[in-house]
Amino acid sequence: MTSHLCCSNYSSPLPELLVCLHTEGSLTALLEVKAGQPLRVERSFEGYRLLSLAQKKQLGMQGAALSRPRLAWVREVQLYGNDELPWVQAQSLFPLSSLQGSARRLQQLKSTPIGYVLFKRSRTLPNQRFIKHTVDGWQRQTLYNWYGRPLLISETFLPQFCEKQLDI
């Protein structure tokens, strides 16, 4: 019943979830506090994919760049706290143009939470955030400006997280 409160088709998320959706800084750090342990990351996909038109627009591409095929390094993971079921489903999009120099390490994350890398030197990063409801739950899509490079990260809060961790 409580998962319906968090992840049903309400016009806005409950206040308990709003804290997670709008947290500035590392979501990884917030989730690890809630779990009382490091997050476990399971990768479901990691590799190159063509960006969709919507993704190109979200990444700030304009004009002729929208009509050209663009590759990105895509990482899709499930984040586990202290439960058997995942708490968050996440997708990270790194346009190839963003993977220059030391940013290439973003292709080598394996089971490391991305928050460990993005927020290593700074507690917050310049970003634009969009919140929406999906069939899987409430999602935050954040376009980060990481050292002048755009990175798009989508994080969907799954029913298990809402039910067990938000006390709703």
Swiss-Prot record:
Enzyme Commission number(s) from the entry: 4.1.3.40
Residues in the signal sequence: none
Chain sites annotated for binding substrate: 75, 114, 155
Keyword Transcription belongs to the record: no
InterPro entries from the UniProt entry: Chorismate--pyruvate_lyase, Chorismate_lyase_/UTRA_dom_sf
Compartment(s) where it occurs, according to its Swiss-Prot or TrEMBL record: Cytoplasm
Broad enzyme group: lyase
Catalytic activity: chorismate = 4-hydroxybenzoate + pyruvate
Keyword Transmembrane helix set for record: no
Pathway this chain belongs to: Cofactor biosynthesis; ubiquinone biosynthesis
Annotated TM spans: none
Classification via SUPFAM superfamilies: Chorismate lyase-like
Gene3D superfamilies reported in the protein's UniProt record: Chorismate lyase-like (3.40.1410.10)
GO cellular component: cytosol
Pfam families for the chain: Chor_lyase
GO BP annotations listed: pyruvate biosynthetic process; ubiquinone biosynthetic process
PANTHER family: CHORISMATE PYRUVATE-LYASE
Free-text function comment from the UniProt entry: Removes the pyruvyl group from chorismate, with concomitant aromatization of the ring, to provide 4-hydroxybenzoate (4HB) for the ubiquinone pathway.
Similarity comment: Belongs to the UbiC family.
Protein name: Probable chorismate pyruvate-lyase
Organism: Psychrobacter arcticus (strain DSM 17307 / VKM B-2377 / 273-4)
